[in-house]
A protein has these predicted regions:
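Alpha-helical tetratricopeptide repeat
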Residues: 29-43, 70, 114, 170-177
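Canonical positions in the second alpha-helix
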Residues: 57-58, 91-92, 136, 199
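Residue-level recognition of tetratricopeptide repeat
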Residues: 65, 99, 109, 140-143, ...
């Protein structure tokens, strides 16, 4: 909970600065990461407009601040502006990640890739959804190797949101579901079934899923399973 207090304390200094006249020489100047962190606090509270404003402040202060672009992407996505979300995530994804300045943001690159999966899906571009999903899968595998933990699964802003006692309910399962849907839409039925099985395994769903992908009935089974998984993961 100390992280929350630090963020709120920083906010109080910012507000105090705004109320102090220009004659004061030692106004508090919030750092870009404090601005962005408070944006994520607002995000966790469902205030996506407020979060977006704070993320915008962070990149206005430092146009190279990677997490500010990440927050802008996710906030705009939550507000239903998929095109804008994609633009910010695309702008920020190839920025240089400074793991010395921000050691707690070790998974920041994959946050961008996951966001791009959802933005592409919302836009309705199945090819982009598949491409970004494949990139996400590669990055997650690399993290598993680095951690020596093959069971690792990405969760949005896991460290920060855990400290806030907030469950975003956005994780690797949702990415794989978006990937599966894009595969279904592009008639990649075998690949879709493979991803569905992984989702089922991770969710501890019992039973065998063996639809006949060569038949209309089998493809209908896939569609129904995707609907079930969507309901399950959104609950």
């Amino acid at each position: 909970m100390m992280k929350i207090y630090k963020i709120i304390l920083g906010l109080s200094f910012i507000l105090a600065t705004l109320s102090i006249g220009p004659g004061c020489r030692q106004n508090y100047v919030p750092t870009d990461d404090e601005l962005a962190d408070y944006g994520w606090v607002l995000f966790s509270q469902g205030d996506y407009v407020g979060a977006r404003d704070w993320f915008q402040l962070s990149i206005d202060k430092d146009s190279t601040y990677m997490d500010g672009y990440c927050g802008m992407g996710w906030s705009n996505g939550k507000l239903g502006y998929a095109d804008t979300a994609y633009q910010y995530l695309h702008l920020g994804k190839d920025m240089t990640y400074d793991d010395i300045r921000f050691p707690n943001q070790v998974n920041l690159p994959i946050e961008f890739t996951a966001g791009l999966v959802f933005a592409s899906s919302a836009i309705g571009n199945d090819s982009l959804t598949i491409a970004h999903s494949q990139e996400f899968d590669f990055k997650q595998t690399q993290i598993q190797v680095d951690l020596g933990n093959g069971s690792y699964r990405w969760t949005l802003k896991n460290v920060l949101f855990t400290s806030l006692e907030y469950d975003s309910k956005i994780d690797a399962q949702d990415v794989r579901l978006a990937w599966s849907m894009a595969q279904y839409n592009t008639s990649q039925f075998a690949e879709c079934v493979s991803n569905i099985r992984i989702i089922r395994d991770d969710a501890d769903i019992s039973g065998v899923f063996e639809p006949d992908i060569s038949t209309v009935q089998g493809r209908n089974e896939i569609a129904k399973e995707l609907e079930k998984l969507q309901l399950l993961l959104s609950s």
